[in-house]
Amino acid sequence: MYMDKKMDSGDIISQRSINIDDNMILDDLYYKLSILGRDLLIDTLPSILNGTNNRIKQNEEEVTYGLNITKEEELINFNDSVSNVHNKIRGLSSIPGAYAMLNNKRMKIYLSEKTNNISKEKPGTITDINKNIKTIN
């Protein structure tokens, strides 16, 4: 992005997109974006250096800003939808990590998997411990 006086408002130098599948975690996305960014830089740098790069004006209606994530936002609400819980966990893995409270201690949760298992337990109840992997319904 070309620099401008306002935050994140400059013209776009070049852009590419990537598909994010339903189970991709933050670390996987970071790696894929680093490769994509490297390739984009290699492809775009010559046009910047020789002055032929076509600036793309940003559509101000599509601009978004990333905000700092608070500890409260890291807390998993097991009464939320399965998709929202899963997306929070994978979006916050490995840093800062989503968490739940267990016996008044913060338990970081880095991975999740959606299943079709139906439980009669209250959401967030640990129902199985297998090889140090805790299953939470």
Regions found by a protein language model. Give the residues of each.
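Charge-rich, low-complexity amphipathic helices
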Residues: 51, 63, 67, 106-114
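An anion-binding loop in the catalytic cleft
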Residues: 79-137
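Sequence-level motif detector for i,i+2 pairs with an aromatic at +2
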Residues: 9-10, 71-73, 104, 133
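Short, hydrophobic secondary-structure boundary micro-motifs
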Residues: 54-57, 77, 98
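Acyl-group handling in specialized metabolite and lipid biosynthesis
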Residues: 67-80
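A diffuse structural propensity rather than consistent per-protein peaks
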Residues: 25, 70, 124-127
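Donor/substrate-binding cores of folate-linked one-carbon enzymes
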Residues: 1-65, 72
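Generic alpha-helical secondary structure signal
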Residues: 34-35, 69, 82, 103
